[in-house]
Each structure stands twice: as C-alpha cells, then as structure tokens.
C-alpha cells in the first residue's frame, strides 16, 4: 500500500514545506512508495481526503500540518474502515 501524504505547506508559519522536504528525504532513502498532495486553500485538505478515499481499495493517509490540517483530512475521509490515518 502506497502512503498518501496531504501536506499543508503553510503550516508552522510557512515551515510546512521544509518539514515535508525532510520527510521526503527519509522516504526516498528508505525506498518507500508515496504520493504527495499539497493543500492550496482552507478546506482543500477535506477535498483531497474525500477524493482519495472515494477511490477503491485501502488507503494509508498521512496528514502533515497542524491541528487544522488534521481536522480537515479527518472530515474528508469517506470510507473509514478502509483507511489508516497518520
């Protein structure tokens, strides 16, 4: 199962992208398969999570951001029984 990251680049007063780059380096070095989606506006995390979890199959979604990002992603998950959230 491929990890799916929903990243808020503006979190931590703009440091979200820097934090993502550190995480991405570890993922690449470890050979872990992943997809990344960046939020572009308020509410976008919900839309992204909904789109991802409407697709068939199991999902492993990681929300990278603050409380607001996690809240948006949780609220967008459509099929909770097929989704692992981190």
Model-derived regions: residue spans:
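Small-residue-rich beta-alpha loop regions that form the catalytic core of phosphotransfer
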Residues: 2-86
């Amino acid at each position: 199962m491929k990890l799916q990251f929903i990243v808020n680049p503006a979190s931590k007063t703009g440091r979200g992208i820097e934090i993502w780059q550190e995480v991405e380096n570890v993922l690449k070095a470890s050979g872990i398969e992943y997809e990344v989606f960046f939020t572009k506006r308020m509410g976008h995390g919900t839309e992204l999570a909904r789109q991802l979890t409407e697709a068939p199959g199991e999902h492993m979604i990681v929300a990278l951001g603050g409380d607001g990002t996690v809240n948006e992603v949780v609220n967008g998950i459509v099929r909770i029984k097929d989704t692992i959230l981190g």
